[in-house]
Regions:
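Long, charged N-terminal interaction/targeting segments
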Residues: 1-62
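Short loop/turn motifs enriched for small/polar and acidic residues
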Residues: 34-38, 67-71, 113
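Immediate flanking context of iron-sulfur cluster ligation sites
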Residues: 65-73, 84-86
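Cys/His-enriched microdomains
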Residues: 73, 90, 108
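Short cysteine-rich clusters marking metal-coordination/redox-active sites
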Residues: 75-78, 92-95
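Cys/His-rich microdomains that often coordinate metals
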Residues: 81-82, 99
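Short Cys/His-rich "knuckle" micro-motifs
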Residues: 85-88, 102-106
Length: 116
């Protein structure tokens, strides 16, 4: 699946773009990122792509730590807020309605850095 790696490569480039201004010439040791279950990220591909991007962004030692966020929806029909098991179906597990609002699971956020 080369297209999955291309997707993760662009995500890693975006991460580096966020990190760069905050590093301000210091060594980046750790980058922490929240990834929602609905973002269709392949963790192994993201980690692999990070090893490539960090070399080109002058942060060769920077480790990528991922925190995965489960998907949760609130049903507009029955009002139930539920965790969903499948990233392919965001229907309400209680009443099967597709009229839902995603509460969690769309995150893709750099949450913190460690620099030295």
């Amino acid at each position: 699946m080369w297209w999955a790696t291309v997707h993760e490569l662009s995500l890693c480039q975006a991460i580096a773009g966020v990190v760069r201004p905050y590093a301000e010439g210091r060594r980046v040791d750790v980058v922490r990122v929240q990834v929602g279950a609905l973002r269709q990220v392949v963790p192994d591909s993201l980690s692999f792509c990070w090893t490539i991007v960090r070399e080109h962004e002058n942060m060769p030692e920077a480790e990528l730590e991922l925190e995965f966020v489960t998907a949760e929806v609130r049903c507009r029909g029955c009002g139930q807020q539920s965790e969903i098991a499948s990233r392919w179906s965001v229907c309400c597990p209680r009443c099967d309605s597709a009229e839902v609002e995603v509460v969690r699971g769309n995150e893709f956020l750099v949450t913190s850095l460690e620099v030295s």
